[in-house]
Amino acid sequence: MADMEDLFGSDADSEAERRDSDSGSDSDSDQENAASGSNASGSESDQDERGDSGQPSNKELFGDDSEDEGASHHSGSDNHSERSDNRSEASERSDHEDNDPSDVDQHSGSEAPNDDEDEGHRSDGGSHHSEAEGSEKVHSDDEKWGREDKSDQSDDEKIQNSDDEERAQGSDEDKLQNSDDDEKMQNTDDEERPQLSDDERQQLSEEEKANSDDERPVASDNDDEKQNSDDEEQPQLSDEEKMQNSDDERPQASDEEHRHSDDEEEQDHKSESARGSDSEDEVLRMKRKNAIASDSEADSDTEVPKDNSGTMDLFGGADDISSGSDGEDKPPTPGQPVDENGLPQDQQEEEPIPETRIEVEIPKVNTDLGNDLYFVKLPNFLSVEPRPFDPQYYEDEFEDEEMLDGEGRTRLKLKVENTIRWRIRRDEEGNEIKESNARIVKWSDGSMSLHLGNEVFDVYKAPLQGDHNHLFIRQGTGLQGQAVFKTKLTFRPHSTDSATHRKMTLSLADRCSKTQKIRILPMAGRDPECQRTEMIKKEEERLRASIRRESQQRRMREKQHQRGLSASYLEPDRYDEEEEGEESISLAAIKNRYKGGIREERARIYSSDSDEGSEEDKAQRLLKAKKLTSDEEGEPSGKRKAEDDDKANKKHKKYVISDEEEEEDD
């Protein structure tokens, strides 16, 4: 506000200029009072003329004055005492300066119309506060300052008008709540008006400065009170006051209306843009009033200036005011699908999807399921043949392969004793009856047993938890429910002696036992080839042993000869006569036999005559050859074998000796 003081001066300067302008404003005020009186008397005719010309009334343009008048009363109540004192001082100055009683009478006579006119302008200023606060403020202030500059008003008149002036000042307080930029723009708009004189512009600037200095601290305190009292405090003006206000507004010159029309439109848009941050309730009321004002302004072309489009482009319209709390004004999220009404698809009401019903006629299948239904999970040792038994199409089960049921479990080989079968046959009368190889027997103690052929199985009953087991009948591609199982049955073999139990145990044993891959068969007879080889080996061992014995005996005899002379050695012919028929060996004969015998034996072994003769000769020659090879080994031999060899050698020696003796005799 420092700029405002530099431009328009201080309060002291404005008081001095006001005293100077009092004298010159008397004549103007007289004319205005006369015009206002005449206009007040003929208000009804003017109202009809304005209705015919199509110009909307202030009530139609700006809504009911009662909405914002309560707020102006409340906002201006705090400064009532201060301003009343200022007004009383101004009235005292005017009383001292004006001493002419005729002027006092003249002004007292025009007191009622002036008061009415002032009240009309001030009430209109309060009503314009909601829509066009700035425009009516300028217009009402011009007239107010033009009338209040009169120095001939009495103290009573000033005191009576003080309350009405405070209402207009309350409307000015709302305008001063806006930012400094809005005030500067308003001041520049007021300065650019060419129709206003310099005195009027100076008065307007002084008024704005005074109001800003006096009411600025109060405006911030009354913001919350105005917002809270908008809905509570309603207009207190009666219908007569409204009519009087409208009649007081009409006598203004048409030139002044055209002159201030541009200012009014600009002030409307400024006030609307400045009040964009008000509460949601005020914004909604602004929208309703602007809608009414826009309708009335569209009807009257005379009220809209030519440069209204430029003003709309500069400040925007009432439709541009947006409340931050309205979710409908928010733009849709980028990337979110939007329907034809501009709303996101997730905000649309979800329409229920109609159900698709297809009417199909299906025959109802009724089956006699009996009184009790039981759910049975067959063990691997029981099976059921669903088809009736027919000997023509019966196929025996495979014994070498294990059968797999529909559930993939390994079952025992299906035999007659563990498969439930049934058939249809005719009785003696020719009626068809059903027979089965199984039956369930219920005993007196409540227990049950299943008799399947010669096998007996114990049946145990247990309840089923939950409704998860149902009986369905397949019908085409669909299933038709028949019943719900509540009880289940389990089967167990009655004893371990049953054939079924034995099959179970045998099957388990077969799975666990390991088969021997290699089998050894016992030999029934002996192989002749193997026997021959064994006999050859034994014979060779015996020959080797005999050869070893002979060599050993020879060494023993040689040792005995080397010990000394003996009787047989010294007298070899002593017993010849006595032992003619007995065997006798001389030393010379032994030497000759030994020397010649070796040569002959060697010759015999390697001669061609060895092939001739018996097998015994061959065996003897073989033994002799082996003895010659084993002389050097010197292995000991058994005593018994040595005696046998000695006997054989003695016999041979005897034979050899006898041959030599015969040759000698010859």
Swiss-Prot record:
The modification Phosphotyrosine is found at Y606. The modification Phosphothreonine is found at T188, T629. Residues 1-14, 179-192, 574-583 have a biased composition (Acidic residues). Component of the PAF1 complex, which consists of CDC73, PAF1, LEO1, CTR9, RTF1 and SKIC8. The PAF1 complex interacts with PHF5A. Interacts with TCEA1, SUPT5H and CTNNB1. Interacts with SETD5. Component of the PAF1 complex (PAF1C) which has multiple functions during transcription by RNA polymerase II and is implicated in regulation of development and maintenance of embryonic stem cell pluripotency. PAF1C associates with RNA polymerase II through interaction with POLR2A CTD non-phosphorylated and 'Ser-2'- and 'Ser-5'-phosphorylated forms and is involved in transcriptional elongation, acting both independently and synergistically with TCEA1 and in cooperation with the DSIF complex and HTATSF1. PAF1C is required for transcription of Hox and Wnt target genes. GO terms for molecular function: RNA polymerase II C-terminal domain phosphoserine binding. It is found in: Nucleus. Residues 70-96, 119-178, 193-218, 239-285, 547-561, 636-648 have a biased composition (Basic and acidic residues). Residues 32-44, 316-325 have a biased composition (Low complexity). InterPro entries: Leo1. It comes from the Eukaryota. GO terms for biological process: endodermal cell fate commitment; mRNA 3'-end processing; negative regulation of myeloid cell differentiation; positive regulation of transcription elongation by RNA polymerase II; stem cell population maintenance; transcription elongation by RNA polymerase II; Wnt signaling pathway. One of its GO terms (cellular component) is Cdc73/Paf1 complex. The modification N-acetylalanine is found at A2. The modification Phosphoserine is found at residues 10, 14, 66, 151, 154, 162, 171, 179, 197, 205, 212, 220, 229, 238, 246, 254, 277, 279, 294, 296, 300, 607-608, 610, 614, 630, 658. This is RNA polymerase-associated protein LEO1. Residues 1-361, 547-583, 602-666 are annotated as: Disordered. Keywords: Acetylation, Activator, Nucleus, Phosphoprotein, Transcription, Transcription regulation, Wnt signaling pathway. Belongs to the LEO1 family.
